[in-house]
Amino acid sequence: MQITLLKGKLHMASVTQAELWYDGSCAIDKDLVELAGFREFEQIDIYNVDNGERFHTYVILAESGSGTISMNGAAARKVQVGDRVIIAAYGQMNEAEADEFKPKLVYLNKDNSVERTTNTIPVQKD
């Protein structure tokens, strides 16, 4: 049986641009793409923490070190510059692979600099 697990995420990224008339996609700083284990043209989910919007798009590369998170095309209507978003990618694997798999979790500061990286999320307590 195949199951779908979180492969990687950029947590609390700040939207730096919203370009309605650019080809649809999400441009992400190449360094952040690599840290999260994303691939160019990979499908991603965007969860807008500020307004609750959730949508799919795909990754395109922005300049390394730029901190760019740009929602383009129709996705630009789902955000405002400065919104905080979670960008997630998922992968399918069998249960044996899932037992050994660790996601790439990248936590960002407001300026999209890396606060920390990890591969676990602590157990939620009351």
UniProtKB/Swiss-Prot annotation:
Cofactor comment text: Binds 1 pyruvoyl group covalently per subunit.
EC number: 4.1.1.11
One BP annotation, GO: pantothenate biosynthetic process
Reaction(s) this enzyme catalyzes, per UniProt: L-aspartate + H(+) = beta-alanine + CO2
Gene3D superfamilies named in the record: 2.40.40.20
Main location: cytoplasm
UniProt KW keywords: Autocatalytic cleavage, Cytoplasm, Decarboxylase, Lyase, Pantothenate biosynthesis, Pyruvate, Schiff base, Zymogen
Xref: CDD domains: Asp_decarbox
Metabolic or biological pathway: Cofactor biosynthesis; (R)-pantothenate biosynthesis; beta-alanine from L-aspartate: step 1/1
Residues that, per the record, bind substrate: 57, 73-75
UniProt-annotated catalytic positions: 25, 58
Superkingdom, natural source: Bacteria
SUPFAM superfamilies found in the cross-reference section: ADC-like (SSF50692)
Molecular function GO terms recorded: aspartate 1-decarboxylase activity
Major enzyme class: lyase
Cofactor(s) needed for function: pyruvate
Location relative to the cell: Cytoplasm
A cellular component term, taken from the record's GO annotations: cytosol
Subunit structure: Heterooctamer of four alpha and four beta subunits.
Family from the record: Belongs to the PanD family.
Name the UniProt record assigns to this protein: Aspartate 1-decarboxylase
Organism in which the protein naturally occurs: Marinomonas sp. (strain MWYL1)
